[in-house]
From Swiss-Prot:
<dbReference type="GO" id="GO:0005507">
    <property type="term" value="F:copper ion binding"/>
</dbReference>
<dbReference type="InterPro" id="IPR033138">
    <property type="entry name" value="Cu_oxidase_CS"/>
</dbReference>
<keyword id="KW-0325">Glycoprotein</keyword>
<comment type="similarity">
    <text>Belongs to the multicopper oxidase family.</text>
</comment>
<comment type="function">
    <text>Lignin degradation and detoxification of lignin-derived products.</text>
</comment>
<feature type="glycosylation site" description="N-linked (GlcNAc...) asparagine">
    <location>
        <position position="233"/>
    </location>
</feature>
<keyword id="KW-0732">Signal</keyword>
<protein>
    <recommendedName>
        <fullName>Laccase-5</fullName>
        <ecNumber>1.10.3.2</ecNumber>
    </recommendedName>
</protein>
<feature type="glycosylation site" description="N-linked (GlcNAc...) asparagine">
    <location>
        <position position="393"/>
    </location>
</feature>
<feature type="binding site" description="type 1 copper site">
    <location>
        <position position="425"/>
    </location>
    <ligand>
        <name>Cu cation 4</name>
    </ligand>
</feature>
<feature type="glycosylation site" description="N-linked (GlcNAc...) asparagine">
    <location>
        <position position="77"/>
    </location>
</feature>
<feature type="domain" description="Plastocyanin-like 1">
    <location>
        <begin position="25"/>
        <end position="150"/>
    </location>
</feature>
<dbReference type="Pfam" id="PF00394">
    <property type="entry name" value="Cu-oxidase"/>
</dbReference>
<feature type="glycosylation site" description="N-linked (GlcNAc...) asparagine">
    <location>
        <position position="366"/>
    </location>
</feature>
<dbReference type="InterPro" id="IPR011707">
    <property type="entry name" value="Cu-oxidase-like_N"/>
</dbReference>
<feature type="glycosylation site" description="N-linked (GlcNAc...) asparagine">
    <location>
        <position position="74"/>
    </location>
</feature>
<feature type="binding site" description="type 2 copper site">
    <location>
        <position position="87"/>
    </location>
    <ligand>
        <name>Cu cation 1</name>
    </ligand>
</feature>
Amino acid sequence: MGKFHSFVNVVALSLSLSGRVFGAIGPVTDLTISNADVTPDGITRAAVLAGGVFPGPLITGNKGDEFQINVIDNLTNETMLKSTTIHWHGIFQAGTNWADGAAFVNQCPIATGNSFLYDFTVPDQAGTFWYHSHLSTQYCDGLRGPLVVYDPDDANASLYDVDDDTTVITLADWYHTAAKLGPAFPAGPDSVLINGLGRFSGDGGGATNLTVITVTQGKRYRFRLVSISCDPNFTFSIDGHNMTIIEVGGVNHEALDVDSIQIFAGQRYSFILNANQSIDNYWIRAIPNTGTTDTTGGVNSAILRYDTAEEIEPTTNATTSVIPLTETDLVPLDNPAAPGDPQVGGVDLAMSLDFSFNGSNFFINNETFVPPTVPVLLQILSGAQDAASLLPNGSVYTLPSNSTIEISFPIITTDGALNAPGAPHPFHLHGHTFSVVRSAGSSTFNYANPVRRDTVSTGNSGDNVTIRFTTDNPGPWFLHCHIDFHLDAGFAIVFAEDTADTASANPVPTAWSDLCPTYDALDSSDL
């Protein structure tokens, strides 16, 4: 760790080599985290920003690249956290568990006035990802942005004409009150931002600018849809256009035609849009499941504009979805079978995670996750090898190496109350993708070709979503609800995978070892 060490000299080189000219950065870059006032929906508030913008700048690279992202913490605002971490959502971090970014699982936070270099490779991954703070609810205050790893040999390349920085679409919930100053569980966002712009339906809002996405009639576009949400899921659609899904969270899938996509916090999809309609303006809609749930006056909206169309707001009308995305229709393009034997419990280790809530905290198997003062990775490197020795007590599960694992998430109702209110809860597993052998809304198991992803909705009452993965990546990996307010209330566990080989598989840099002493020395006002 260093004081504001800079990589700007190599940033210019990497940008010139990548040829991407729409403001993207990476794979070698500085990423400065600072406070600034922003007005994305007509209301001004102080925020935590990456690169001085919301959402944070698009970070790009190619399959096989080494990413070297130097995070510089310039945070000073007393109403929000001054320390930070960055998680690279969906990146496996094989051999670099220390760079996964989950505070108190994989690292101590970066102290204000300091920097830390995240250095990792993506040898076997390509697709649509994102990055965000993984310290308490900090990303709800603005520290979130898209990450794309391009594949020069993309199997789907023949299906589209355009795939660049202009075809990334982020969906965000936005709050006018800093996360630590507001309620523990907000009733809903104040607005929804599409690529950083939206409208607030309350006092002081009005007809603010909306994001305009421009297409040329006759071309086919690969849009990369990224939910950088803290809480709500969105129903996404584009008036007058169908979408063909080809990628789910960094995994290529068979082409699937839909006219709406329900997308949960942390999820990503690539879809092909054929710009085959008349030259005009069309509403893009992203309706959240909480807060304002319509599009009156252009809230929850952006604009799809064909080249040469008049620069006015659309007059198109929403229609009832007739081919909405159904998760069980998604089929991986390569190696589609789930790990293990094709039967219930046909794995090396199966477990059920039972949820509960006491009014202020969430529990998994009767334990609420309380961040330890010593990161789980550091505990393992210091000699702790079994669950009984690892903190937080009851929230760390050791997993054997090279084994098939099955996890079930039963959602039940007792005396009229859900075991975990605020459903549906999207659960994200770090360090892996998994096969969803039973999806929300389904009572059947699919072992032959289930969707493969890293973030899944666990559904509603009566659901028992079940996932499978293989333990081929030593280290501690977070499994948690991606509704960030729920995570902050303890809705998480850690899988300590192959603890015996964690140290040899994940050599840590000196700068990582310096993080905890620096953070632990901070005054409470600088945390």
